[in-house]
Amino acid sequence: MNGRRLLPGKPIPPSEIPDYSIRRDTLEEVFAEPFRLRLKRIAELVKQSGEPLEGNIFYPDLKDGYAGEPPEGDLAPARRNVWRAVRFKERLLEVGVNAGHSALLALSSNARLEYYGVDIMSHAYTAECVDFLKGEFPGRVHLFTGDSREVLPWLVGRRAELAFDVFHVDGGHTDEVCRSDMGNCIQIARGQRGRHVLLDDVHASWIFDVYCEFVSRGDLTTETFFGDWEEAGRNVLARIE
C-alpha cells in the first residue's frame, strides 16, 4: 500500500483549506504558512529548553539541526497517515505528547478536532510546547499529566463523557507499556461505533507483535481505507471492535 493517487476534487474556498493537507493526485504535502510558523516556534521552544529533541513525526530522534529545517522527507508517509486517520474525527486522545508535533499535525488537518494528550512530562520542553498549542488552538488542546498506565484507567471511567473517537499510541516504547496503553484505549472505546487506534513505531518487532496480539484476539481490525494507507509510514491504523 503506497497511498492512492486520486483525481482532485472541486476547488476548496481559501477559508476552508486546512493548514496541513495533501494533494490527492501526487500525495505532495501542503504546509500553509501558519503551520510553518507554528512548527518553527515549537523548534525554538525545544532549543530554549537545552534538551535534545526526541524523535517525532517531523524529525528523526536526536537530530541536531532541526530548527529551521523542512520536515524530514522520509517521514512524509507517516504524516500523511496521521492526516488520513484524523481528518473525519472529532476527539483525539494521544498517548505520548513529546514536543507536540503530532498534535500540531492533527489539529492542522481538521479544524473540528479536539486534542487530548497524555504525557509523563519527562522532557522540560513539553509543557511550554503544549501551552503554545493551547494559545494557537483555543479550547481545542487539553493535557493529562502522569504515567499512561495510571491516567488511562482513570479515563476509562470518563469514557462516556469524553467520547474519544480516535486514539494515537506513541508513549513508552516497551512491549509492556505498549500493551497496557493499547489495552486501555480499547477499553475506553469499547462498545462505541467508529473508534480507531493509530499505533506508531510498528517497524519495531516488539511493538508489531503487540499489535498482532490484539488483532489475533479480535479486538482490532486493520484499516487501510481501501489501500490508501502507506505502509512506509511505520504506523498502523485499526478499527476497535
Which positions does each model-derived feature cover?
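A short alpha-helical cap/connector motif
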Residues: 1-168, 172-241
